[in-house]
Structure formats: C-alpha cells, structure tokens
C-alpha cells in the first residue's frame, strides 16, 4: 500500500443516474483521504460501477471488470449489475465485493477492508458540491431513486427499487452548491422525473424563506431562482407535465422536454405497460408548441417489440411525421434478463428489427435536418463545451450533453471564447445533427426585433 494517501481507481459505466452514484462514492473517498488515480497500475484497489439494463450493457460491464482484474487484481463491483452477484462471481470469483446500485455504505466498507483509510479526514480538500465527473460548467442533479412503473421491457425497479424522492429542500440546497461551484447548467435526472414527490405526498419544505412542495413544478420554480440553465430529463408523459410548459415560456426553465413515448401503437403500448392514448399525446405535443414555440421535444422509441406488425411499425413512422419531434433516439428491442416482455409471443426476427430501425432513423434524420435548417438565420444562446482548433464547440438550449447535437462556432477562437461561456450565436448552416454559426461579439448589445443580443462571460 502507498506510504502516502491510499489510491483508488474508478470505472463508471451506464446512465447519468449511475454517474451521480459514482460522484457520490468518489466524494466520500476524497473526504476520507483516498486519492483517485487514472490508471490501474497506480491504484491500490479499483471500483467498477456497472450497468445491467440491456444485454450489451451487461457485456460491457463484465468486460470492464475483467480488464480491471487483469490489470490490477483487486476489484470492488457495484451498480445495477451488482443486483446479479452470482453472474459476476461466476465470471470473476476473485472480486473483493459486489453490491447493488446506490449502496454507498457497502462500497465504502469494501474499500476500507481492502485499503484502510487514513485517520485524519480531508474534508477541506473536497469542494462543498462534491467530486464531479462532468465538466465544471454542467452537472446532473438526481432528484429521486427507483421507479413505481412496471414497463414490461424494463428491469430498473428490480435493480433500483420503487420510487424514493429526495426532499425538495435537499435538492435545492445541492443545486445551490453546484451553482456556487461554477455550474451553468443543471440536468435534472431520475427514473421518472414527473413522479417526483408522490411517495412523500408532496410534502412542503422550506428553502430561502419560502415553502416549496416536493413536486416537479415547485422544484422547477425553485431551480429557476438560481439563474442557470435547468433541463428536464426522463419525464413520464403524465398530464401534469403541462404545468411546467408555462415556466419554459416565461424563460425560467429551458424549453426542453426529454419524454420517452416508446411507441405509437395503442396495442404495443399496452403490451409495454405504457400510456396508450396516442391521439392525446399528439394533441399535447401541439399544445406545448403553441404555449412555448421554442420548445424542443426529445423522445426515445423501441422498434421491433414482440408482436409489432408491419402496420403498427408504419403507424410509428406516421407518428414521427405528425409529431415533428426535434430529437429522437431509438433501439431495436432485445430481451433483457428478468423482463416480463421476454414471455410475449410473436417475437420479431432480428433482421426485421434492424431493417425497421434503419427506416425509423432515416425518417427521423429527414425531420431533424429540416427542423435544424429552419434555424438558419436565427440567433441561439449557446454554452461552450470545448475549444478545438480555434472553433468553439457548444450546445444550444435545445441540446443536452452527449445525446443531442452541437453548435460549431466558427469564430470562437477569434473571440477568445472559453469553456463555460454563454454566448449568442448567429446560425449560418446546418446538417441533420448539428448547427454552425458565428458568435456575436461582446460590447454594445446588437438589437434585433424582439430581443437583445450580447456575449455573456459568466
């Protein structure tokens, strides 16, 4: 063991919720005096935070464990795949410990057993917002754990349990700390953001001399007081989602909804155990756009679900034409160990699934390209993520990190833009994924009808 601080390597896999779990473990490790190192060779022990949602994620997680075992030999496994300890130990019987998601205590106990901590705490070395794995200018804000739904294709409840919401004041205080630490964008995540607070009966809690309900709209009202971008992810399509559109129209919340519709056939949605009123869904999308013309709607879909007919797949393509969604992700259905959909009849052949997925994505690519083309000539507020060869790579209010498009600011180097800058960009070109443009220079605001334009270095 090192004569100085004990050293821990860390591998984080999976979704943004798992990333937050990793950040919490890393924060506790630093508080207790452990150094976090970037290589297996430098580590005294390695923690692997796994994903187990779909078969490809299981394979990736097992491969990561194997790589850590081969390179280091002392490995602690946690995360969603940890809910299947027998699968891990069958492949790698010499792992030191296995625990499930958000079981921070078990992870720390395993680290202590393998690598005793120093006795003096290092709290002063850890910022009050904790250790973050994202760039400094944005952060994921997890508001709850688990899910009360039982979608037939999903095993998340068996891994992460039923919904457990964090009290609203606790979430708002964490958001405050993040903003004090330089965060310009808060990405609200959970398994079901729109169910936030139902398990707490929407209990009221005080924050900044005001009472707030533990409810999605009230949380958004509180977050809007912090003066940074706030983006909602994983919103289940409940009717009360309509309540936050007004906040978007007022500029208090980013006009962006990540809302997984999954399919457009009422019969398939019923088999998925998802809401099935497609006509109402289309009406609501149109109503959101009427209330907030700038709104961006992102969604995800599954093609080739068991029993999906040619006609039902065509109805899904028709839905894309009618809904005109801005951003869409999709994947071909694959059985997930433990999911009830595995037992459904009429499984779709693999070649049909992949042919449908290709057609689906081609259809949406056409829609996305036209929607992005319509932004040429407009001015978009953007947040700079990276500087590459005198070009600033940024995201507009319509783009979440990792999953959406980018804005390539051609004169970013000329203007001396930096990562984390907020800047107004005049859009000059587009393709099916990204926008291209020039930042408007700082100095006196440039007036255009309906708005003031100005470079903001914040």
From Swiss-Prot:
Stated family: Belongs to the methylthiotransferase family. RimO subfamily.
Compartments, record wording? Cytoplasm
This enzyme catalyses:
L-aspartate(89)-[ribosomal protein uS12]-hydrogen + (sulfur carrier)-SH + AH2 + 2 S-adenosyl-L-methionine = 3-methylsulfanyl-L-aspartate(89)-[ribosomal protein uS12]-hydrogen + (sulfur carrier)-H + 5'-deoxyadenosine + L-methionine + A + S-adenosyl-L-homocysteine + 2 H(+)
What cofactor requirement does the entry state? Answer: [4Fe-4S] cluster
- A GO MF label: metal ion binding
Q: GO terms for biological process?
A: tRNA modification
Cited InterPro entries: Elp3/MiaA/NifB-like_rSAM, Methylthiotransferase, Methylthiotransferase_CS, Methylthiotransferase_N, Methylthiotransferase_N_sf, NA-bd_OB-fold, Ribosomal_uS12_MeSTrfase_RimO, rSAM
Q: What class of enzyme is it?
A: transferase
Task: Return the EC number.
Answer: 2.8.4.4
Give the matching Pfam families: Radical_SAM (PF04055), TRAM_2 (PF18693), UPF0004 (PF00919)
Q: Which residues bind [4Fe-4S] cluster 2?
A: 147, 151, 154
Domain of life, per the record? Bacteria
Q: Which residues belong to any copy of the Radical SAM core domain?
A: 133-371
Q: How is the cofactor bound?
A: Binds 2 [4Fe-4S] clusters. One cluster is coordinated with 3 cysteines and an exchangeable S-adenosyl-L-methionine.
The record's function comment reads: Catalyzes the methylthiolation of an aspartic acid residue of ribosomal protein uS12.
Name of protein: Ribosomal protein uS12 methylthiotransferase RimO
Binding-site list for [4Fe-4S] cluster 1: 15, 51, 80
Please state every residue range assigned to the domain named MTTase N-terminal: 6-116
Q: Which residues form the TRAM domain?
A: 373-441
Q: Which UniProt keywords apply?
A: 4Fe-4S, Cytoplasm, Iron, Iron-sulfur, Metal-binding, S-adenosyl-L-methionine, Transferase
Any GO CC annotation of this UniProt entry: cytosol
Sorted alphabetically, which Gene3D superfamilies does this protein's record hold?
Methylthiotransferase, N-terminal domain, Nucleic acid-binding proteins, tm_1862 like domain
């Amino acid at each position: 063991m090192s004569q100085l601080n004990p050293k821990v390597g860390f591998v984080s896999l999976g979704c943004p919720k798992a990333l937050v779990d990793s950040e919490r473990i890393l924060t506790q490790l630093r508080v207790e005096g452990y150094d976090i190192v970037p290589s297996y060779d430098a580590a005294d022990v390695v923690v692997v935070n796994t994903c187990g949602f779909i078969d490809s994620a299981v394979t990736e997680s097992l491969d990561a464990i194997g790589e850590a075992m081969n390179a280091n030999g002392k490995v602690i496994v946690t995360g969603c795949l940890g809910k299947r300890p027998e699968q891990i130990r069958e492949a790698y019987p010499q792992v030191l410990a296995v625990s499930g998601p958000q079981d921070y205590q078990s992870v720390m106990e395993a680290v202590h057993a393998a690598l005793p901590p120093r006795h003096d705490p290092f709290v002063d070395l850890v910022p009050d917002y904790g250790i973050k794995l994202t760039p400094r200018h944005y952060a994921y804000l997890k508001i709850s754990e688990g899910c009360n739904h039982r979608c037939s294709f999903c095993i998340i409840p068996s891994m992460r349990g039923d919904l457990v919401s964090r009290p609203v004041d606790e979430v708002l205080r964490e958001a405050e700390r993040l903003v004090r630490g330089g965060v310009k964008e808060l990405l609200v995540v959970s398994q079901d953001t729109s169910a936030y607070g139902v398990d707490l009966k929407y209990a009221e809690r005080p924050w900044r001399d005001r009472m707030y309900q533990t409810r999605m709209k009230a949380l958004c009202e509180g977050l809007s007081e912090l003066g940074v971008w706030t983006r909602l992810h994983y919103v289940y399509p409940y009717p009360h989602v309509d309540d936050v559109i007004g906040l978007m129209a007022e500029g208090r919340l980013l006009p962006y909804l990540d809302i997984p519709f999954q399919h457009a056939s009422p019969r398939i949605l019923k088999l998925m155990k998802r809401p099935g009123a497609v006509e109402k869904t289309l009406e609501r999308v149109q109503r959101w756009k009427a209330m907030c013309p700038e709104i961006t709607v992102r969604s995800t879909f599954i093609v080739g679900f068991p029993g999906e007919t040619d006609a039902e797949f065509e109805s899904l393509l028709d839905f894309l034409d009618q809904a005109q969604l801005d951003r869409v992700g999709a994947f071909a259905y694959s059985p997930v160990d433990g999911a009830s959909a595995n037992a459904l009849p009429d499984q779709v052949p693999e070649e049909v699934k992949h042919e449908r997925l290709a057609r689906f994505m081609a259809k949406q690519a056409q829609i996305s390209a036209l929607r992005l083309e319509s932004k040429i000539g407009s001015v978009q507020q953007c947040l700079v993520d990276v500087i590459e060869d005198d070009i600033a790579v940024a995201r507009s209010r319509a783009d979440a990190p990792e999953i959406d498009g980018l804005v390539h600011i051609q004169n970013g180097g000329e203007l001396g833009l930096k990562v984390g800058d907020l800047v107004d960009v005049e859009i000059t070109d587009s393709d099916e994924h990204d926008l291209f443009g020039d930042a408007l220079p700082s100095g006196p605001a440039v007036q255009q009808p309906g708005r003031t334009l100005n470079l903001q270095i914040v």
